[in-house]
Amino acid sequence: HPGGVVITPDPVCNHVPVENAAKGVPLIQWEKDGAEKGGLVKIDLLGNRSLAVIRDSVAALEKKGRFTASGWEPEDDQKTKGSVSCGRTMGCFYIESPAMRLLQKKAGTGNFEQLVIQSSIIRPAANEFVPEYVRRLHGGTWEALNPGLENVLDETFGLMVYQEDVSRVAVALAGFSHSEADGLRKVLSKKDRELRLRDYRDAFYKGCREKGVECRETDRIWAMMMSFDGYSFCKPHSASYARVSFQAAYLKAHFPAEFMAAVISNR
């Protein structure tokens, strides 16, 4: 797991076997799931080349006296919103893929709040919900999946978009405790989820029955939960991605030469 870092209060070798990699980097001899089960604190530190693109663009512009990053709020910039809504985002972090550019064009909003939603709903297992999101975004009628979910998913037009939505629905509809609901969220992101998912499914269906939810509705809601299979974002993750995307889109919209030079230099 190349991006995983384990943090311990004293030397890590006191807690787990350690070996040195060929490049001299110390590695624990447990895989990531075993490390978590063993009580070690594991965080993922992944590199993001787009941060270097933004850094180099800003440095070049500040050197020329054309820009200052102090108090910079790209989310409020109309030119940036226009570029995003038209899909003119090649070179911009996370929103340059064909799928994201097409979604930007269909959405046509270009605002930060919707980009946060779009950054999460674009996940592979949720493709079927993207057209429905666009329809509802443009004023299409919709109803809550169940009366018990009114005001739970209003922000996302009644669709489950973030990992937290799975937990919130499980609490509101099936009477899960918050720890049980978070356990379901975690299981959905694991490769070996089938080993425990059956128990969560049975508990979810049982809780829904006890609250009077029809089996057909429960099936629909569970199917939407399954769209979080393996790859999905929590809202803070999606918001942080959207923030970087907007910074890149701002620089491209206002300073395309310096921005693209930084993109090429960091390939």
PLM regions and their residue ranges:
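Noncatalytic, beta-rich nucleic-acid-contacting surfaces in large DNA/RNA-processing enzymes
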Residues: P2-R267
